[in-house]
């Protein structure tokens, strides 16, 4: 309950959020927080672990109504992954700025730790990929590519955009609806123009 209440505040306020603000959002007294957590840093670290759990976004993807039209389901997939990525990034940045957790570099890890990290990331991606593919499964016959390939492409595009921060503001902005339309229909008309004549024709 405390962690769930703290995450939106971390996204909105950042590392300056106080335990009193978190307690009020959770509907408890401030001292109650410290019965579960040693200090604010431990709470922030727990928030990062919670928001990084891929199970939350997988559940959200599984909740997308399969009878919705394909364009609406695609928008829902993009919004779900995008929101999760932005939320995770905001919390991770707040935790980093607060000094609650120092990220380990790849070089500082043992081989066993690197293997565990790689396995965890692969497992997380596999569960996310399966959930996205399942959303498109009802329209498998209408797609040009297998649903697994569609899921791979959608994830690659949305995750790549997410690495640059918010992608719906600024001069190079793109809306979720615009991205969904691009994925569904590409950049050409249904009847592409004929090839330009070669010199000498």
Predicted regions and their residues:
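Amphipathic alpha-helical packing segments from all-alpha helical-bundle domains
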Residues: 68, 72, 90, 94, ...
């Amino acid at each position: 309950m405390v962690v769930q209440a703290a995450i939106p505040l971390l996204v909105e306020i950042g590392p300056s959020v106080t335990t009193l603000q978190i307690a009020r959002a959770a509907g408890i007294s401030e001292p109650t927080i410290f019965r579960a957590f040693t200090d604010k840093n431990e709470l922030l670290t727990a928030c990062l672990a919670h928001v990084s759990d891929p199970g939350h976004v997988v559940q959200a993807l599984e909740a997308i109504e399969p009878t919705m039209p394909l364009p609406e389901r695609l928008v829902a997939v993009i919004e779900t992954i995008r929101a999760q990525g932005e939320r995770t990034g905001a919390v991770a940045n707040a935790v980093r700025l607060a000094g609650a957790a120092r990220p380990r570099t790849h070089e500082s890890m043992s081989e066993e730790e690197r293997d565990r990290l790689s396995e965890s990331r692969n497992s997380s991606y596999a569960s996310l990929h399966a959930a996205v593919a399942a959303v498109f499964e009802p329209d498998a016959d209408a797609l040009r590519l297998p649903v697994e390939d569609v899921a791979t492409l959608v994830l690659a595009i949305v995750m790549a955009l997410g690495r640059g921060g918010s992608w719906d503001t600024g001069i190079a902005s793109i809306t979720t609806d615009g991205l969904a339309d691009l994925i569904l229909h590409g950049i050409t008309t249904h009847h592409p123009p004929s090839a330009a004549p070669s010199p000498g024709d």
